[in-house]
Amino acid sequence: MKEINPKDTTRAYAFEMWMQAPNPMVTFFKTLDVSRIVRISRRKGLKLNMLMCYCIGRAATQVKEFYMLPVGGKLMKFDTIAVNTIVANSAGEVSSCDLPFSDDFAQFGSDYLRLTKQVADSCVDHDLSSESMVVGTSALAQYEIDGAVGMYSGIFNNPFMIWGKYKRGLFKTTLAISFLFHHTQMDGAHAAKFLDILQREIKNLKA
């Protein structure tokens, strides 16, 4: 992670307009067709949350704005992406686990299992925010929700995605997601592009 001059980037105007806004976060809603990864999860015994996190990481690496993030009033540049997941720990509470994104599916899956177990057992968060731009996620897989807004803490500016229980239809299985992002980091067009790429990655996942 290193500081960059906003004026030397495509985010110069956004930094000036949105950095000091009372609430600079924007939320998009989208319904994804997750039929393919639900089938893969069932047939291969892979965790659906891991498959979602992998596809999110794949999509994020294809949008250059994900490699920049406003942190502490400055614009920072990152070389790598990580995907965060929330883990139920051994104390009956939850812990945070940052997963380094690897395009190698087997490597990402191995890291997912190892790190989530480590965090669950130790009750100690695994934090990569000083070295990677972290995409936050929260899966409320037991509950039916239509979306979530108002997740801005004023401290963390990271993009964040939340979803609930998927819905089975006659021809496809769908998942409603909310995607929260800081307007300094990206514009609506970048966020929409990311969500379109995410849908494509889900439909084309080879595992």
Say what each PLM segment does.
Residues 1, 170-172, 195, 199-207:
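Charged, conformationally dynamic linker/hinge segments
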Residues 4, 19-51, 67-83, 135-137, ...:
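Gly/Ser/Thr-rich phosphate-binding loops and adjoining beta-strand/alpha-helix segments
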Residues 89-145:
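Helical lid/core segments from catalytic subdomains that handle acyl or acyl-like groups
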Residues 148-180, 184-186, 194-196:
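Intrinsically disordered, low-complexity linker/assembly segments
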Residues 115-123, 127, 161-162, 178-181, ...:
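Plant-skewed but cross-kingdom recognition/interaction modules and surfaces
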Residues 59-66, 201, 205:
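Short alpha-helical functional segments enriched in proximate histidine and acidic residues
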Residues 2-3, 21, 81, 113-117, ...:
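Conserved GHKL (Bergerat-fold) ATPase module
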Residues 37-62, 175-194:
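Acyl activation and transfer enzymes in specialized metabolism, enriched
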